[in-house]
Amino acid sequence: MDKDTELSRDDFLPNVLTACEYDGKLAILPQTFSLQTVIGKAEDVGTTPGWTVEDMKALLASKPEGTQLFWGMDRMSALTALMNLGYNDFINWENASCNFDSQEFIDVLDFANMFPEEFEYRDDMEDSTVLMSQGKQLLDTYYLSDFEQVQMYRAIFGGPTTFIGYPTSEGNGAMLSLNNIIGISNSCKDVDGAWQFLRTFYLPKKSSDGDSDYTYGFSIRKDDFEKYCQNAMKADSDSGSTWGWGEFEVEIQPATQEDVDQVKDLVYNTTAVSGAVSDDITNIINEEAAAYFSGQKSAEDVAEIIQSRMQVYLSETK
């Protein structure tokens, strides 16, 4: 790309390029992306994205008994949610070291253990949208790819919402979900020829409303993304149409400037990538945590075992 006369890094969202780099080089490039985050009522979680496990625990503790964070969450899914971005808090990737035997990680295990061992679905259970509207469910996982969903959640929660994100000590708690990823193999015999083909997917469109030509998500081209945001504030064929979810129906209106600013702030400040952590790492944690959740071992013992296994893994894969 750096040698291309028509395309430059300035044409693309800088945070997406950063997320696609490995060892300082652009390794892959998606065509579109969405954002994976957690949404909640601003009255509950505040207006600034980003919080910690302690913040999440404090919110739940402040609510009446029976209030739940997410719908249908059991111990393992709670641990997954807590650790979606939490790995960076316990692993030093550069030094291949970790601190899973810390009190902070033990607290994560203890918090996850507060959830039921298994989620038992019943036909008479209230819909998630009803629980959120009544304040009985505080959060929901959110895959952001358009502005219509923003309006839907605002109606469900009955007020302004915040993309609070998954708990982490740094950042906004959101992750990029990359779509239609392509790249050039190290073994490619004609890199220039391969690029001449791949570049066609990223050239500026002669006529575009900024909406993606692909299946899902926002375009990674900066001009297309900005155009899409501007057009979202204009009345179009979707304006006045009705979106339904559970017990709720919302008449879709043009996005407000506040909606656009909120989404753009999240997009431009997210560099973490969903699925970037090896399955080997998540398997180590889940396998050992199961012994604590079943009462076979203490949280402290499990944390020590995870620390030992993880350190060996990091050393071997450094």
Locate the predicted segments by residue.
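Hinge/lid segment of periplasmic solute-binding proteins
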Residues: M1-T37, T162-P167
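C-terminal lobe and pocket-closing loops
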Residues: Q151-M152, G171-L176, G183-N283
